């Protein structure tokens, strides 16, 4: 199966992530490809993850701001629960009464490293759509860096902020809203669904159409067939 998430910004920036995964009893990442480029991001970056071999390739610009590209390739021992590109999919499949769910993620900082995501439901919150009242489950996703780096990250101001996601439950769960950064050290963006807007069309004069349709009706017997 394939999941793709694309954000196109007004300034021309693009966030494009495609994840290929299997869904046999459990979700299993096969391949993930992330591209971030444009003024909205500090540095353009491209990350490729091969779930079968553990190879992770990160392409980004140097910190000195020059145009030259830096490529880092590493092999990681990827656990079966690695969730790059699958977080929203997983949230729509997690039981809302689960106390906490933990999954793994490859973080490009820019050197690839494994971190944990701790997903905790915070209860239901009301919202409305089309005049109809609904309730969405509010999830908090916390990044656990682990090791010595995890111990000093909060002290150095490098602990990533929590991600907040709201999911509409039911037989067909759906994403409602999220508040999260799209890259390490980036601002928190609010992402939510919007209603489609159609171009204004002139009002249809149904009475005129009815009269026009009536005027083209042939009287009885007007149509005949000659042999």
Where do the protein language model's features map onto the residues?
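Acidic, serine/threonine-rich low-complexity disordered tracts
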Residues: 1-51, 99-227
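Surface-exposed beta-loop interaction hotspot
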Residues: 59-99
């Amino acid at each position: 199966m394939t999941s793709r998430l694309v954000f196109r910004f007004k300034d021309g920036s693009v966030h494009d992530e495609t994840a290929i995964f299997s869904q046999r009893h459990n979700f299993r990442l096969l391949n993930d490809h992330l591209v971030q480029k444009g003024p909205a991001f500090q540095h353009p970056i491209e990350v490729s993850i091969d779930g079968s071999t553990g190879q992770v390739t990160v392409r980004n610009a140097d910190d000195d701001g020059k145009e030259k590209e830096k490529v880092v390739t590493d092999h990681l021992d990827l656990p079966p629960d690695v969730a790059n590109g699958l977080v929203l999919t997983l949230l729509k499949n997690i039981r809302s009464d689960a106390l906490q769910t933990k999954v793994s993620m490859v973080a490009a900082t820019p050197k690839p490293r494994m971190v944990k995501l701790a997903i905790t439901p915070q209860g239901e919150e009301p919202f409305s759509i089309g005049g109809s009242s609904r309730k969405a489950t509010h999830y908090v996703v916390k990044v656990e860096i682990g090791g010595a780096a995890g111990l000093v990250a909060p002290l150095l101001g490098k602990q990533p902020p929590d991600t907040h996601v709201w999911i509409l439950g039911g037989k067909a769960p759906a994403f409602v809203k999220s508040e999260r950064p799209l890259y390490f050290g980036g601002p928190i963006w609010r992402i939510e669904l919007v209603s489609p807007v159609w171009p204004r069309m002139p009002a249809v004069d149904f009475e005129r159409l009815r009269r026009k349709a009536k005027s083209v009706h042939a009287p009885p017997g007007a149509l005949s067939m000659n042999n």
